[in-house]
């Protein structure tokens, strides 16, 4: 390990401790889990990504989401509100959660999240035919942040 890598190794743990607000004991537990080291080693590359969920179907949406609307998230899964529609339906976000989780798991495993086979999810509203109001279907894509 070169000097730069050694320095980063020290800094990253201090940064994570401060970022997560961990006590020394919590940080000890965190560091003892080898999965956390693996995830942190891949975090810089993931943070260069933008997760995009595009509305590919919409009918009767109370929040007025339309086909082509996009919801943007950073690589860690945080909603980038300034890039999203003015109103974002919580039920659409609920549909986004498992897709973002799966895309991050694939990324950490070294697999391109865009290769996900089932990359669509729908809001919880069943649509008017089933006693609801509307329905929105989202499709996930992951791109370089500079392209988003």
Predicted regions and their residues:
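Glycine- and charge-enriched low-complexity intrinsically disordered segments
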Residues: 2-34, 94-148
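Beta-strand secondary-structure signal
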Residues: 50-54, 137-139
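Short alpha-helix capping/helix-loop boundary micro-motifs
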Residues: 55-60
